[in-house]
Amino acid sequence: MQIYMVGGAVRDRLLGRPVNDHDWVVVGATPDDMVARGYLPVGRDFPVFLHPETREEYALARTERKSGRGYRGFVVQTSPDVTLEEDLSRRDLTINAIAASADWTGAEDLFDPYGGARDLQARVLRHVTDSFREDPVRILRVARFAARFTDFTVAPETMQLMREMVHDGEADHLVPERVWQELARGLMEPQPSRMFDVLRDCGALAVVLPEVERLWGVPQRPEYHPEVDTGVHLMMVLDMAAHLQAPLTVRFACLTHDLGKGTTPHDVLPRHIGHEQRSARLLKAVCERLRVPVECRELADVVAREHGNIHRSGDLGAAALVRLLERCDAIRKPARLDEILLACECDARGRLGFADRPYPQRARINAALAAVQSVTTSSVAAHAAQLGLSGPKVGEMIHAARVQAVADWLHATAQPAPEPRGNAG
């Protein structure tokens, strides 16, 4: 029985990156051998075991044979006769197909039959063998790695293979859970735009996210968007979200906030009046199709509907500001308002020449919320009771008190209006 470190741990160590998790492959063993040594079986589709002390995963060396379309169409074979090279051959990229002895200290301890170390040096993402085409999830993984390793390029032959897979319909069989899983991971990488560049280049974006694909080539008003192209703007917004270290909820909201611009009638371009409502409808379809988690779905919906109003909040009076806060549910969920405003800031700064501009709307709306929170609702309700009021009338009094508090704040501070964003959104 021989044990080797494989995959991302070897790759990241060779790149000088932090190694958080270790993956191990075991050659020459049976499941009974592993159990006899105290390993805990946990694999559902193939033999994977947890180390009795470290709890790290150890997988028996295996081969995979395509038996149908999509992610699940595989027959897995494990036996003590499966070699390390055979196990590595089923992996997606050469940089992930390097093995090392458990106590490796240098290059002499590496087993690299497919040139992964060479591709690490050359900064190339290259498929291991033609069996890459058997799993369409690998298209998404290559795109995600492009977003992580921002100085790597996709090998031309790998890009061509991915295009062939899309043309042959393999991407049509991606299951929603895996699409979302890879999309979420890609959004959290240092340069998310590169994921979408790769997916567009191979044609997969039109399959998995046609609502996003159609944004390229859609013009916006240049006085608000010097970059003009909506797809280009979207990528700038995503990279700004990464730059500001936004959480996944915010990054997904950034991805989907302008979907409605892809359905703007051609005869009104480059204006996009009402795109916020259209974006929300398209967002709902995306979330249902990909089974997006509720926290991402809810934040993205608010951002899609309200980002234009938040951009223009400098033009809003007290009553309109309070209504905006209420629509954002900011009074009950002030922490979520921070994420809404962060997404809007990414939108505003994700424009050509605006990356270093301030976003005073954030401070203005937070100050308006503070004024609203200064209203003691129990005191207002008690006063309403003294007046013999109940039910909806109490709510109206609370709302009026909040509007007055914001009006007093606006008057006391003589708040200047932020730079207008117009209707560009």
UniProtKB/Swiss-Prot annotation:
Cited InterPro entries: CCA_bact (IPR012006), HD/PDEase_dom (IPR003607), HD_domain (IPR006674), NT_sf (IPR043519), PolA_pol_head_dom (IPR002646), PolyA_RNA-bd (IPR032828), tRNA_CCA-adding_enzyme (IPR050124)
Residues reported to bind ATP: 8, 11, 91, 141, 144
The entry's keywords: ATP-binding, Hydrolase, Magnesium, Metal-binding, Multifunctional enzyme, Nickel, Nucleotide-binding, Nucleotidyltransferase, RNA repair, RNA-binding, Transferase, tRNA processing
Cofactor: Mg(2+); Ni(2+)
Catalysed transformations (reactions): a tRNA precursor + 2 CTP + ATP = a tRNA with a 3' CCA end + 3 diphosphate; a tRNA with a 3' CCA end + 2 CTP + ATP = a tRNA with a 3' CCACCA end + 3 diphosphate
EC number of this enzyme: 2.7.7.72, 3.1.3.-, 3.1.4.-
Record domain HD: where: 230-331
Binding site for Mg(2+): 21, 23
GO terms of biological process kind: RNA repair; tRNA 3'-terminal CCA addition
UniProt entry tagged with the keyword Nucleotide-binding: yes
Binding locations of CTP: 8, 11, 91, 141, 144
Coiled-coil region(s): none
The family this protein is said to belong to: Belongs to the tRNA nucleotidyltransferase/poly(A) polymerase family. Bacterial CCA-adding enzyme type 1 subfamily.
Biological function: Catalyzes the addition and repair of the essential 3'-terminal CCA sequence in tRNAs without using a nucleic acid template. Adds these three nucleotides in the order of C, C, and A to the tRNA nucleotide-73, using CTP and ATP as substrates and producing inorganic pyrophosphate. tRNA 3'-terminal CCA addition is required both for tRNA processing and repair. Also involved in tRNA surveillance by mediating tandem CCA addition to generate a CCACCA at the 3' terminus of unstable tRNAs. While stable tRNAs receive only 3'-terminal CCA, unstable tRNAs are marked with CCACCA and rapidly degraded.
Domain remarks: Comprises two domains: an N-terminal domain containing the nucleotidyltransferase activity and a C-terminal HD domain associated with both phosphodiesterase and phosphatase activities.
Alphabetized PANTHER family for the sequence: MULTIFUNCTIONAL CCA PROTEIN (PTHR47545:SF1)
Note, other: A single active site specifically recognizes both ATP and CTP and is responsible for their addition.
NCBIfam families per record: PRK10885.1
Subunit structure: Monomer. Can also form homodimers and oligomers.
Annotated protein name in UniProt: Multifunctional CCA protein
